[in-house]
From Swiss-Prot:
Belongs to the LipB family. This is Octanoyltransferase LIP2, mitochondrial. It is found in: Mitochondrion. NCBIfam families: lipB, PRK14345.1. InterPro entries: aa-tRNA-synth_II/BPL/LPL, BPL_LPL_catalytic, Octanoyltransferase, Octanoyltransferase_CS. It comes from the Eukaryota. It comes from Arabidopsis thaliana. PROSITE patterns: BPL_LPL_CATALYTIC, LIPB. One of its GO terms (biological process) is protein lipoylation. Residues 1-32 form a transit peptide.
Length: 235
């Protein structure tokens, strides 16, 4: 009989991308040292483009110098994947979890992230699917609704998933999302006829779907972001 699994979830609101990256690095180090339990960051970012390890420059369709004019930042990262947009009105989840402790390999981990978003979409009557061989993320037909880009270091995960609730779609016009040409991007707002609740509720629902998919027995919600963000600033 396995021991109970607990997931600690931090609701962080809107966080600058680099600040969240530094926080993830700190938490990964602490998880490796068994100083913290499996942890999940639930947040949004100001408009930000990130490039993963499979990046190709031609998938950013405007000069980097033009990004400030549209109010966006660009950052190079060590996650998997190509170029992705992160911004307001997305549900972004960054799991910092030990794959060894839950008995998952890398592929099973990514597939479970996909299932989490698919299960969430079904709450609103949206039939989503995992990407095919040349696709990444989660799709509704041929339209992409959720992106996945992860990093695994010594069995500890970081980065994660971004699901489109109702982002400004103009930001996607400046990139080839995840390096896949000729595909549309969509959102929960566009795909459902259901009246959407607050984004806080949507974040909580997505977290619950993820916790269920990974068979966590308990979710501990942390409601005060200053407790983790302020500690980071003091170090």
């Amino acid at each position: 009989m396995r021991s109970p699994r607990t997931l600690e979830v931090w609701k962080l609101g809107t966080v600058n991308y680099l600040k969240s990256l530094k926080l993830q690095e700190k938490l990964v180090s602490e998880r490796k040292a068994h100083q913290i339990p499996d942890t999940l960051l639930s947040l949004q970012h100001p408009p930000t483009y990130t490039l993963g390890k499979r990046r190709t420059d031609h998938n950013l369709l405007i000069p980097e110098s033009e990004l400030t004019k549209i109010g966006a930042e660009l950052h190079y990262t060590q996650r998997g994947g190509d170029i992705t947009f992160h911004g307001p009105h997305q549900a972004i989840l960054y799991p910092i979890i030990s794959l060894r402790s839950i008995g998952f390999g890398a592929r099973n981990y990514v597939e479970t992230l996909e299932r989490s978003m698919i299960e969430f979409a079904s709450i609103y009557g949206v039939k989503a699917r995992a990407g095919n061989k040349c696709e990444t993320g989660v799709w509704v037909g041929d339209r992409k609704i959720g992106a996945i880009g992860v990093r695994i270091s010594s069995g500890i995960t970081s980065h994660g998933l971004a699901l489109n609730i109702d982002p400004d779609m103009k930001y996607f016009e400046h990139i080839v999302p995840c390096g896949i040409a000729d595909k549309e991007v969509t959102s929960l707002r566009r795909e459902t006829d259901t009246l959407l609740p607050s984004e806080e509720v949507i974040h909580e629902q997505l977290v619950s779907c993820l916790a269920k998919a990974f068979s966590y027995d308990d979710v501990v919600w942390k409601e005060d972001p200053s407790l983790i963000l302020d500690t980071q600033d003091k170090e």
